Amino acid sequence: MTEKLPLEISNDVIESFCRKWKIEELALFGSVLRRDFRLDSDVDVLATFAADAKWSVFDHARMREELSTLIGREADLIETKGLRNPFRRREILATRKVIYAA
């Protein structure tokens, strides 16, 4: 049985967003996957970018805003290579749910 996520966003919309921003893998993690997800919770999103994706800080802000609009709630967008704390990295990678893979 496929687990239903508490987000209303189509696979086509996710794929279009990922192609536009050169995202090779997009995954959810955190409370969105647990029972403590609430109406006021943000959505934690993990992105792995293509090697040729060279985005500025402003691009990341636009990306986060666009993603927040698409999912209908605040998104916290984290880049996989930015996960430097080994304990946090291990936990996120072990519990994430991939929603797009190129």
Show the residue positions of the predicted features.
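Catalytic core of pol beta-like nucleotidyltransferases
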Residues: M1-E25, L33-R35, L39, A50-A102
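A short, structured beta-strand/loop element
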Residues: L39-V45
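Conserved histidines in hydrophobic membrane contexts and catalytic metal-binding motifs
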Residues: L28
